[in-house]
């Protein structure tokens, strides 16, 4: 049976979450009507994902829905925000009901996990792409930003950057991993990244700055450096690698992927010396490793990478949509 735009929305995307009392009116009218809780600041982020650019054209729709939402959740995590609402503008080449069912089921599984509600959006015909607008709340005056780092702050990352780039390389047959368990782990790190929502919330009163690693550590830490007007010194020997990555990738390639591979969606953040003990307590029970990799400083500009005690020059760069190939 043919499925028009409005029946498509009703069948696959109009799923009300009654637990969200801040939504007066969701899908079905010209606008959503929403209430911002008292003493909360609204945090908003938007991402566009295009087939062949941000994801492989033959990706499983369940993985696509998960990743599309997860990367937006990662932006909220970087600000220390609580997830609340989502808008979705979806462009489809045709109506494939099996594809839509898999996509929407996966999307709502993750929405429900974070007690979020889809409040509106749009559908149209064209090459496969989507734009998501995510909304969350952060207590007034407690949001994490890129601009708060101070000289002397210690620089940390969660998880093990570089895994996502390795997973993509496996999917593109650029990396051969014979161990099925390791291959599955790395592919999952690319297709289904874990937004560090709890870590971001725990950092509200501990970190001076934070950012999520979407374009690679070089690029993203560079944003903190620029916004905070101070330098950063990184000890390459301190960068954490997963066992799966270390077993199948040469050290220099692992380092390159960790610094410039992108799409890890871990958090990079800076913490003053005074808060390091509290940081261990706040993040230590959340089940995700976090590693100190360097220090912010006033005596250099930009990023300085140290190997065996000496500065080294790296010509790697993070991902840039408009960079000249």
UniProtKB/Swiss-Prot annotation:
Enzyme class: transferase
Positions contributing to Mg(2+) 2 binding: 47, 75
Pfam families: AIRS (PF00586), AIRS_C (PF02769)
Cysteine pairings via disulfide bonds: none
Residues reported in the UniProt entry to bind ATP: 121-122, 146, 214
Reported pH dependence: Optimum pH is about 8.0.
Annotated positions binding Mg(2+) 1: 46-47, 122
Pathway linked to the protein: Cofactor biosynthesis; thiamine diphosphate biosynthesis; thiamine diphosphate from thiamine phosphate: step 1/1
Activity regulation behaviour: Is markedly activated by the monovalent cations K(+), NH(4)(+), and Rb(+). Is significantly inhibited by ADP, AMP, p-chloromercuribenzoate, N-ethylmaleimide, pyrophosphate, and EDTA.
Catalytic activity of the protein: thiamine phosphate + ATP = thiamine diphosphate + ADP
Binding site for substrate: 54, 263, 319
UniProt keywords, alphabetically: ATP-binding, Kinase, Magnesium, Metal-binding, Nucleotide-binding, Thiamine biosynthesis, Transferase
Positions with a binding annotation for Mg(2+) 5: 215
EC number: 2.7.4.16
GO terms assigned for molecular function: ATP binding; magnesium ion binding; metal ion binding; thiamine-phosphate kinase activity
Superkingdom as given in the UniProt entry: Bacteria
One GO term (biological process): thiamine diphosphate biosynthetic process
Family stated for the protein in its record: Belongs to the thiamine-monophosphate kinase family.
Protein task: Catalyzes the ATP-dependent phosphorylation of thiamine-monophosphate (TMP) to form thiamine-pyrophosphate (TPP), the active form of vitamin B1. Cannot use thiamine as substrate. Is highly specific for ATP as phosphate donor.
Cross-referenced NCBIfam families: PRK05731.1-1, thiL
HAMAP family with a match to the protein in the record: TMP_kinase
More details: Reaction mechanism of ThiL seems to utilize a direct, inline transfer of the gamma-phosphate of ATP to TMP rather than a phosphorylated enzyme intermediate.
Stated name of the protein: Thiamine-monophosphate kinase
Organism: Escherichia coli (strain K12)
């Amino acid at each position: 049976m043919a499925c028009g735009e409005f029946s498509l929305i009703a069948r696959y995307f109009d799923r009300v979450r009654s637990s969200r009392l801040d939504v007066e009116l969701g899908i079905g009218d010209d606008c959503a009507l929403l209430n911002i809780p008292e003493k909360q600041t609204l945090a908003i982020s938007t991402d566009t994902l295009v087939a062949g650019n941000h994801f492989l054209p033959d990706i499983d729709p369940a993985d696509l829905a998960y990743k599309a939402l997860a990367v937006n959740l990662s932006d909220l995590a970087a600000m220390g925000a609580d997830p609340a609402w989502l808008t979705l503008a979806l462009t489809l080449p045709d109506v494939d009901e099996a594809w839509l069912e898999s996509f929407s089921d996966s999307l709502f599984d993750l929405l429900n996990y974070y007690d979020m509600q889809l409040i509106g959006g749009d559908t149209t015909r064209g090459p496969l792409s989507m734009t998501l607008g995510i909304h969350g709340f952060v207590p007034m005056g407690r949001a994490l930003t890129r601009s708060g780092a101070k000289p002397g702050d210690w620089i940390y990352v969660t998880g093990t950057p570089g895994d996502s780039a390795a997973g993509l390389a496996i999917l593109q047959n650029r990396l051969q991993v014979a161990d099925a368990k390791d291959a599955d782990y790395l592919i999952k790190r690319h297709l289904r990244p874990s937004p560090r929502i709890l870590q971001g919330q725990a950092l509200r009163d501990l970190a001076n700055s934070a950012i999520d690693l979407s374009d690679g550590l070089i690029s993203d830490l560079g944003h903190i450096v620029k916004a905070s007007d101070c330098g950063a010194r990184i000890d390459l020997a301190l960068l954490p690698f997963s066992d799966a990555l270390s077993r199948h990738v040469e050290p220099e390639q692992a380092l390159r992927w960790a610094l410039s591979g992108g799409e890890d969606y871990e958090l990079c953040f800076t913490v003053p010396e005074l808060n390091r003990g509290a940081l261990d307590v706040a993040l230590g029970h959340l089940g995700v490793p976090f590693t100190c990799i360097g220090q912010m400083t006033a005596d250099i500009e930009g990023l300085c990478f140290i190997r065996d005690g000496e500065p080294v020059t790296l010509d790697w760069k993070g991902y840039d949509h408009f960079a000249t190939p």
